[in-house]
Amino acid sequence: MLIDGFGRKVDYLRVSVTERCNFRCQYCMPEKPFSWVPRENLLSYEDLFKFIKASIDEGIKKVRITGGEPLLREDLDFFIKMVFDYKKDIDLALTTNGYLLSKMAKKLKDAGLKRVNISLDTLNKETAQKIAQKDVLEKVLEGIEEASKVGLKIKINCVPLKGVSEKDVLEVLEFCKSRGFVVRFIEFMENFHAKDGAKGLNSDEIKAIIAQKYPNFKTVLRDTSSPAQYYELEDGYQFGIIEPHKDDFCASCNRIRLTAEGFLIPCLYFEDAMSIKNAVQSNKIDEAVEILKKVLKNKPEKNKWSQKDDNEVSTRAFYQTGG
């Protein structure tokens, strides 16, 4: 069992396989060109798997593949099959923007993928293009349809932005409700790489919009293993809101992140990291596990978004850590 310095059980590993992304979303990616990490500096699938295998042996129950955009890395289904074949009952999931998903969904499902989280901030073509800096909506919707068709469990992630997509909150909710998908609205997490002036809706503003049509929704008892607070409409449909600005958001954090370069990240907000790259490439797996335990001991109690200070902006590059 893996325990951090505050007694929290850590059983969830998020693995970024690439920092590259084919979108330039306002809340995540810088607009100006910059240098990607050279591909030869990334851990191979084999080395990533060595660490995942050891982490599972130490008590990890859930593995999520992230990016950047993970579907940009070739042979991702091969990598997922490696993990699935080692531990068939592992909770194996993927986070994606959905743009390439229609061609990959069946391969991923056949490889052992169980669930997929897909970003959908709007159902308006022009708004989607404004957010992603690219014409994306049609292909994202095709990806969602194909993932559903092949039997992947789907959650939709939506980051409502003030003055951009706040008018689309109800439409996204209705889209998911009609298809039986869970939707989670995510408060914008201020970060160094977001577009200047980007502002998100807070949880109260999101709830106020939903209450315009569904005034009698109620709060659901929180599942401490989930970052979202869920709410239930009168017909039983549940939606979630992820609230990183709330004081208790980090209280039950159960996750650790591994970047494609081999850095272990204890917290999405902070820059602190330690590398397991040399250890896994040298097959010193015990050393990699010791680094993991050391990183967990350094895991902070909470992020700084909860201080409700507009100056608290994370310098973490979210596209490298998968959010």
From Swiss-Prot:
Keyword Iron-sulfur on this protein?
yes
State where [4Fe-4S] cluster 1 binds.
C21, C25, C28
Give the cofactor binding note. Answer: Binds 2 [4Fe-4S] clusters. Binds 1 [4Fe-4S] cluster coordinated with 3 cysteines and an exchangeable S-adenosyl-L-methionine and 1 [4Fe-4S] cluster coordinated with 3 cysteines and the GTP-derived substrate.
Q: Locate the compositionally biased regions of type Basic and acidic residues.
A: 302-313
Tell me which residues bind GTP.
Answer: R14, R64, T95, K155, R255, I256, R257
Which keywords belong to this entry?
4Fe-4S, GTP-binding, Iron, Iron-sulfur, Lyase, Metal-binding, Molybdenum cofactor biosynthesis, Nucleotide-binding, S-adenosyl-L-methionine
Quaternary context = Monomer and homodimer.
What is this protein identified as? GTP 3',8-cyclase
This chain's source organism reads Aliarcobacter butzleri (strain RM4018) (Arcobacter butzleri)
Classification of source organism: Bacteria, Pseudomonadati, Campylobacterota, Epsilonproteobacteria, Campylobacterales
